[in-house]
A protein has these predicted regions:
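ATP-dependent adenylation/nucleotidyltransferase module used to activate substrates
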Residues: 3-150
Length: 150
């Protein structure tokens, strides 16, 4: 187990062989078209989530869900009919250096130009909410991301 940082956070970091970027991008449009790409496009259209000239921030935690969302938006920008800008942001709330490095490596491998900024949230949480850090940590991270996206 690797410590994420702070006193209450631990995660298991899987270290697996990465697939080639071209294979990953092709699988989004081909292999996972029905289960992922089509549903993503349907939601974008049904809820008018992307309109001409929009600037969209995709927050990346480093997990598979946010990395997939980033790739979906890249593919939409590349193949879509609407002109929009997309920016990929990631917050470093005080990650263990290995965790931050893994985030950077994964984004580089996936050709996701992520902008990482520091927030020191884990330090604040360790001082203010040692016994039950998760609720306050989640609220603070969300607030920081909303402000950064503006």
């Amino acid at each position: 187990m690797s410590e994420l940082a702070g006193n209450g956070c631990q995660i298991i970091v899987p270290f697996e062989e990465r697939k080639p970027l071209k294979e990953i991008e092709r699988s989004i449009l081909k292999k996972y078209r029905k289960y992922t790409w089509s549903k993503f496009i349907k939601a974008i259209k049904d809820y008018k989530l992307v309109e001409e000239g929009d600037k969209i921030a995709v927050a990346i935690s480093g997990g598979k869900d946010s990395l997939l969302m980033a790739k979906l938006f890249q593919e939409l920008k590349k193949h879509g009919q609407v002109n929009f800008d997309v920016e990929f942001i990631a917050m470093d709330p005080g990650y263990h250096p290995q965790i931050k490095e893994l985030l950077i490596e994964n984004c580089e491998h996936l050709n996701i130009p992520v902008h990482i900024y520091e927030s020191k949230i884990f330090e604040i949480i360790d001082e203010k909410a040692k016994e039950y850090p998760c609720y306050l940590c989640a609220r603070m991270r969300r607030g920081h991301l909303y402000n950064k996206a503006k």
